[in-house]
């Protein structure tokens, strides 16, 4: 059975955890301390005295690459490469014997183990008081305190298939939480099924520090692949439970610090938010389902796990990258023709992705692109850059140059309007509505990309810079903007891609900043401007340059920023936190 206290002791012994013993406030103060430590690539934090709660708070468990590797010491892409090798090779005794450890691991993942623990490790409240939980308010305009690491367990009312997902939960009162079910997530699908039957959906929320449970809950697994099964496989041992809940039948996992049981209420919605999210902006107030808690279990010495999200890089970036590294060998198996794939955490993962594919016949690359956009959470990708060249996808400037050198604007740009959009992304035409852009660059280069801008100053443009070969960045404002005039500017004709930003120096300060400012503030259908040369058989041909308007535009939400009072408080107390 997993022990969070043992994990805390281990991290402390590795100088990867600091204990903070002075009283701290879960309203804004803890989050600001956490963000500063993450920015400095610092340790996990255990806050022992949290105002208004008897429970300590653990944050920043995954805040560096080193710590993620410590938490998953035996977990690498080699595991999934072995699976691919086994599945792709003709069966033989020698092959099966060589990979016998996989079979042991697979057997360990089957089923769950009931542990007869006396006394029970959990204390029980049948009249729950959620105000005892030290839920964090992370940003000054957040709608209230939130559970930020909830592992939300549901089962399909249709077939009983389970799902474990992570959906933020806002506290409304001592027994009611908002349930931020997003599109393309299993819990939301289960709630839809329940509402079709006019039934409430049983929901169990685990708060656990088990890294494997957390990793499994956010993994983009194929539908109907149980996350608890995946967790057991990753940690190479069965998950254990003390009992099953008498009403829902859900397992009460031993690895939990807290367990909340209850229901998502059919037909009932309540305004949820705002919330400073992992895109780096506030997601706005919208109506979402509610969770009515009927029981609260917690361990006697429970530790409350939490995280803080915001502008990249935060904890979720390192955990998301670990997942991509682990699952990358599976891409060619799940999506034949796709050799490598990366979603960029710098843009909140869903806004931007790139892939290396095979082009063995005419337009096979487009087939692979459409396959990617039809796969689970990848279907929420906005900008997808595709090439058949061997390029390091971690190096986004090189990837961008590779595609821009090869794009034939008569056939290699495809804009899909009126598609589903990530719930947290407000660049589209409405809530959950947006568009997608596919940018193909395959074969031999067809153009030489400029390295420097040699033209004159441009009307309405205050500064001009270069991100990489072929990509020009112009500083302007909504008031000065004249895109039709820019499209006719002859000195831009040699630049395949032109980006419009408010702050050139910030946009070019790093690749991370460029990606975040460019792709979280634009949508392909509404913000990509390029002259149409002809339309033949419903096929649109274009003439470069592409001008991407990445300015902040109404009604985009605000960028998250700590308030001055909290910043001053944390600065003044810094040496008391870390004496």
From Swiss-Prot:
TM spans (from-to): none
Family annotation (PANTHER family): 3-OCTAPRENYL-4-HYDROXYBENZOATE CARBOXY-LYASE-RELATED, 3-POLYPRENYL-4-HYDROXYBENZOATE DECARBOXYLASE
The record's listing under Pfam families reads: UbiD, UbiD_C, UbiD_N
GO CC annotation terms, alphabetical: cytoplasm
Species: Chlamydia trachomatis serovar D (strain ATCC VR-885 / DSM 19411 / UW-3/Cx)
Checking InterPro entries in the record gives:
HBDC, UbiD, UbiD-like_C, UbiD-like_N, UbiD_Rift_dom
- Protein family membership: Belongs to the UbiD family.
Which Gene Ontology molecular-function terms are recorded?
carboxy-lyase activity
Q: What is this protein called?
A: Uncharacterized protein CT_085
């Amino acid at each position: 059975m997993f022990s969070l206290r043992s994990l805390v002791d281990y991290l402390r012994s590795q100088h990867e955890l600091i204990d903070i013993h002075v009283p701290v406030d879960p309203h804004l103060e803890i989050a600001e301390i956490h963000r500063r430590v993450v920015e400095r690539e610092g340790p996990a934090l255990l806050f022992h005295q949290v105002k208004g709660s008897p429970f300590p708070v653990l944050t920043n468990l995954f805040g560096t690459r080193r710590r993620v590797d410590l938490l998953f010491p035996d977990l690498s892409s080699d595991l999934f490469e072995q699976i691919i090798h086994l599945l792709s090779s003709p069966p033989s005794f020698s092959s099966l014997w060589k990979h016998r450890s996989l079979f042991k691991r697979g057997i360990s993942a089957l089923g769950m183990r009931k542990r007869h623990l006396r006394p029970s490790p959990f204390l029980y409240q049948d009249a729950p008081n959620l105000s005892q939980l030290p839920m964090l308010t992370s940003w000054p305009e957040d709608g209230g305190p939130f559970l930020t690491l909830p592992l939300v367990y549901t089962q399909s009312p249709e077939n009983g298939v389970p799902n474990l997902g992570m959906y933020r939960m806002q506290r409304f009162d001592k027994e009611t939480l908002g349930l931020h079910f997003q599109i393309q997530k299993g819990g939301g699908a289960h709630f839809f099924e329940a509402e079709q039957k006019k039934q409430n959906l049983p929901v169990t929320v685990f708060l656990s520090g088990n890294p494997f449970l957390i990793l499994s809950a956010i993994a983009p697994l194929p539908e109907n692949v149980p996350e608890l099964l995946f967790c057991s496989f990753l940690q190479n041992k069965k998950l254990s439970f003390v009992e099953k809940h008498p009403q829902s039948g859900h397992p009460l996992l031993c690895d939990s610090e807290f367990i909340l049981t209850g229901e998502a209420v059919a037909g009932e919605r309540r305004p949820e938010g705002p919330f400073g999210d992992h895109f780096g902006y506030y997601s706005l107030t919208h109506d979402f389902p509610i969770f009515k808690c009927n029981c609260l279990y917690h361990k006697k010495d429970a530790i409350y796990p939490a995280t803080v999200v915001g502008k990249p890089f935060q904890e979720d970036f390192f955990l998301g990258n670990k997942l991509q590294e682990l699952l990358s060998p599976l891409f060619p198996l799940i999506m034949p023709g796709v050799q490598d794939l990366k979603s960029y955490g710098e843009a909140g993962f869903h806004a931007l992705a790139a892939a290396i594919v095979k082009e063995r016949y005419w337009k096979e690359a487009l087939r692979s692109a459409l396959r990617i956009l039809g796969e689970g959470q990848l279907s929420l990708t906005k900008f997808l850059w595709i090439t058949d060249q061997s390029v390091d996808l971690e190096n986004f400037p090189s990837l961008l140059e590779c595609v821009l050198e090869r794009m034939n604007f008569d056939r290699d740009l495809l804009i899909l309007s009126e598609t589903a959009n990530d719930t947290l992304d407000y660049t589209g035409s409405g809530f959950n509505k947006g568009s997608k852009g596919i940018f193909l660059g395959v074969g031999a280069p067809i153009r030489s990309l400029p390295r420097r801008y040699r033209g004159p100053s441009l009307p309405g443009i205050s500064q001009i810079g270069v991100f990489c070969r072929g990509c020009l960045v112009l500083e302007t404002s909504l008031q000065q903007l004249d895109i039709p005039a820019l499209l006719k500017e002859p000195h831009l004709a040699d630049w395949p891609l032109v980006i419009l930003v408010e702050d050139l120096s910030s946009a070019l300060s790093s690749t991370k900043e460029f990606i975040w400012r460019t792709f979280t503030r634009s949508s392909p259908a509404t913000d990509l401007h390029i002259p149409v040369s002809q339309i033949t058989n419903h096929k649109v041909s274009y003439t470069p340059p592409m001008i991407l308007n990445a300015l902040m535009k109404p009604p985009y939400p605000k960028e998250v920023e700590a308030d001055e009072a909290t910043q001053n408080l944390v600065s003044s107390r810094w040496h008391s936190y870390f004496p």
